[in-house]
Structure formats: C-alpha cells, structure tokens
C-alpha cells in the first residue's frame, strides 16, 4: 500500500521505498493481501474506514523486500522495491511512492539504487507521452483524472483531502 499526496507524479513511479529497519505485515482485506508497516496497520485501516481485516503470518523485515519487483498500478512497466531511511512511521503506510524526478529524497534514493529518473512533465506543466493516456493534461488537472481512474479500477483504499505545498514553477500553475 503506497500513500501519496501527489497523484500526478504516479506516472513517474519507478520504485516503492520501505525502511529496512521496520517490520512489515501482510494484511488480508476481503480476498486481497496488502503489505504495510506493522506499526501503521491500525492507523491505515482507521484512515481508510476498514474494519474487517486480518494480519496474516508473522511480520517481515523491510530489508527482506529489497530489490523485489512489482507491477505499476496502471502503466505497462515494473518498478523496484528499495530501502531508505527517509521512510518513517509518522504517517502513511511505511511504503513510499518513489519518483526520482519529483523530490530530493526520491532523487537521492533513486540514484543510490540506479533506478530510472522519469520526468513525464514538459516545460509547460503538462504530462508527456510517458504518462500514457494522461499525456497533454496539466499536472493539477491530471490529479482528478488519475484519481478517478484508480478509484474505478479498485486501486484506492481510501483518500483524504489535504492542503499540500509542493515546489513548482509559478509560471506553470
């Protein structure tokens, strides 16, 4: 389960970052299994208004997941599970969406693991062909479209609206 405040960066996702020092649990919800930091299971379930779930098996060290591969949520590509100390237990799921072209922590950890740095945004603030069907949309507008598509696909466990500050070019907004 990844937690993101910047839905428009999902086309640039190349990795999911865990913390190797944390324990992670397999959580069964209905017929699906999800992985998240053991210490955050209750807060994730509460935030997503999920009452019926089961922790299956014993927790596993985040380090055990290092370099595993996963399928991108909607693009025809795979990503890599990597480890970073910037992943905390303060909020979220302990599994961080990582897009090296969008943020200092993401860039640095992507460099460490030689993960591709994908920037599917042009100089005008619109998504490029690297974003698939979202190409041509301004990043702020793409948030709504991507979220709607993820919701329709059943890929959203929950959502909360927040005000978020993100460094961007004032000319592109």
Q: What is each PLM-predicted segment?
A:
Residues 1-11, 23-25, 67-69, 77-78, ...:
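Residue patterns forming the tRNA-binding/recognition surfaces of aminoacyl-tRNA synthetases
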Residues 24-69:
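Carboxylate/His-rich catalytic cores and anion/metal-binding grooves
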Residues 32, 75-78:
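Short acidic/polar mixed-charge low-complexity motifs
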């Amino acid at each position: 389960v990844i937690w993101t405040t910047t839905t428009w960066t999902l086309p640039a996702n190349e990795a999911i970052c865990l913390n190797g020092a944390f324990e992670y649990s397999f959580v069964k919800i209905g017929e699906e299994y999800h992985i998240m930091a053991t210490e955050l299971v209750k807060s994730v379930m509460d935030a997503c208004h999920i009452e019926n779930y089961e922790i299956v098996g014993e927790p596993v060290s985040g380090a055990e997941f290092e370099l595993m591969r996963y399928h991108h949520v909607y693009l025809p590509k795979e990503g890599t599970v990597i480890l970073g100390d910037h992943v905390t237990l303060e909020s979220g799921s302990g599994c961080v969406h990582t897009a090296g072209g969008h943020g200092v922590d993401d860039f640095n950890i992507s460099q460490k693991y030689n993960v591709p740095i994908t920037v599917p945004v042009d100089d005008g603030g619109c998504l490029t062909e690297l974003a698939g069907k979202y190409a041509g949309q301004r990043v702020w507008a793409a948030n709504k479209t991507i979220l709607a598509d993820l919701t329709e696909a059943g890929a959203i466990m929950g959502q909360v609206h927040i005000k978020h500050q993100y460094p961007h070019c004032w000319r592109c907004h």
